[in-house]
Amino acid sequence: DRPAQYLRNTYNTEEELYDVVMEIAKDYEKAAPEIIEWQDFDTDVEMDVLILAHGVVSRSAQGALPLLKEQGIRAGHFRPITLRPMPEEQMRRAAAKAKRILVVESAYGQFLKLVKQSLYGMDKPIDTLLRPGAGVTAEEIADRIKEGR
């Protein structure tokens, strides 16, 4: 057996803790513009659909762009690299040029929730292709977009 450990809060009052948390929040807000990363593909023109995908699913989204272009569908892809901080302004600029949005993820809506929060107030239909724990191919993305036309 070992001797008992007596743990105590580092801060004696809630006010002390509040001050520290607010200082950390201020530092985060100051650093956020330097931390934000994203990539966008073909989002500089009006689009029929904007594909939003994060992580490995983005490779399939990029692969879907030429497939859609062959079929006369103007598509762009926005990939947030950082999710916190989320590149909200950049995502909103891209979304503003699209008639609708397709959120693709290999999870069950966690990324979708972040997207909805970031695009709150925009009048854009949002479709989804959610494949929890499974990969998504470029062909599946293109097929989902064609279904929604």
Q: Which sequence ranges carry the predicted segments?
A:
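Conformationally flexible catalytic loops at phosphate/diphosphate-handling active centers
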Residues: 1-40
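Hydrophobic alpha-helical scaffolding
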Residues: 7-18, 54, 101, 105, ...
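Redox- and metal-dependent alpha/beta enzyme cores, enriched for Fe-S-associated oxidoreductases
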Residues: 37-78, 84-91
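Short acidic/histidine-rich motifs immediately flanking catalytic phosphotransfer sites
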Residues: 46-48, 97-100
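Peripheral docking tails and interdomain loops at the edges
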Residues: 99, 105-149
